[in-house]
Amino acid sequence: MNYESALEYIHAVQWAGHKPGLSRTRTLLAALGDPHKKLRFVHVAGTNGKGSTAAMLASCLQAAGYRVGLYTSPFINRFNERIQVNGEQIPDDALVRLVERVRPAADAMADVPTEFEIITALGMLWFAEEKCDIVVLEVGLGGTLDSTNVIDPPECSVITALGMDHVKELGPTIADIAAAKAGIIKPGSPVVSYGGVPKADAVIARVAKEQNAPLTVVDFSRLKVEGGDLDAVTFDFDGLDGVRLPLIGSYQPKNAALAITALRVLRSRGWNIPDSAIRTGLEQVSWPGRFELLRHSPAFLLDGSHNAHGVRATVQSLRDRFPGQKFVFLLSIMADKDVDEMLALLLPLAKQFVTVAAHTPRAMPAETLAEHIRARGGKAEAAADIPAGVARAVELGGDGPVCALGTLYFSGDVRQAFARLTAE
């Protein structure tokens, strides 16, 4: 087996689809010696900000001197990004070796595991092999029935900002979504919540009480954003002053405040995480594809916001960083998202739209998306593919800003197409 065939196995059609439940993951991990039982975790669930918060947590823990695993999804440029130790992606040869180990166990299962369950097993094997002190583990979807939820009580559970997304899988109300996320709360294990949505907060508080899990809700009254530009946003939070965060979205200081609160909870449990390490970790964090500036002038932004809740935060960031400016939007949206609400948020800032379809069956066809925009009075044209879309958006943008957004699934392709275009 080589790297390409290992990826083909992971992505094989037989594993496709979302099947909630923990039994398959437990069976698979048991056949592999239960590697997760050797590890300690920070478990991160939520609608938006999971990846950014997880990246901040991992960066700060590494700055404190720990060997840190980071498990996230989806990848932007390369599959190996999903499984990292101290900022280094799993090497190709190690991935091949672990796939060869997982394959017979997975193939022997009557109830075949999903792709995500296989990747979770690969991550657990690598983190155990690398003797990680702690693993920052991002939930794939929901919480209660997500395959990452097979772990024993973590060092801390973290619940990021909640909003309406994945309602088909999680339920039609914010309380349903909160209940799914709160499923990661374990007996006696502390939980830190972003908060701010009363109906969701009530659910999380109830579950925490039932599980005898100490609950901390982030006190955003202690957060003061000092300023932001296209290089960093500077903020003070709860005694940490003048932190320069290189993630420039206007929403990122709140994610940082969540991470800081969780790190201080870990410190109260005996982890040696001085504020100096928290500052260093935040100032060195990298998280591609989230309000990321690929070019300063004229600006070309890449953003992975993929639901109305995320687009609302991105729109605020665009207003803050580019006051009074209109954008050419390169847009791809999954067909199961609230397209009309996302467009309603974007249209006031739009000069024009160029639509494309990301390389996933869930993507809305480019022409269908363009028709949605035109029906709302916007200017839109559909591009044949992502490279053509990038080229057209840059052409239409001229000296003005361009923003590519709507899904993380096209971020890698957009980045590559933009790099080729600007290298010519």
Give the predicted meaning of each segment:
Residues K38, I134-L137, L145-V158, L162-G163, ...:
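Nucleotide phosphate-binding/pyrophosphate-handling subdomain across enzymes
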Residues Y194-T216, L230-T234, A299-L302, A308, ...:
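C-terminal helical cap/extension that packs against the catalytic core
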Residues A110, I118, K131-E138, P154-G239, ...:
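Acidic, Mg2+-coordinating active-site environments of NTP-dependent enzymes
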Residues H18, L22, R26-K38, A63-D152, ...:
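ATP-dependent carboxylate-amine ligase catalytic core
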Residues M1-A16:
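Charged, amphipathic alpha-helical linker segments immediately N-terminal to NTP-binding catalytic cores
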Residues V44, S52-G69:
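A conserved segment at the C-terminal end of the G1
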Residues T407:
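Active-site-proximal loop/hinge segments that shape catalytic or ion-binding/gating pockets
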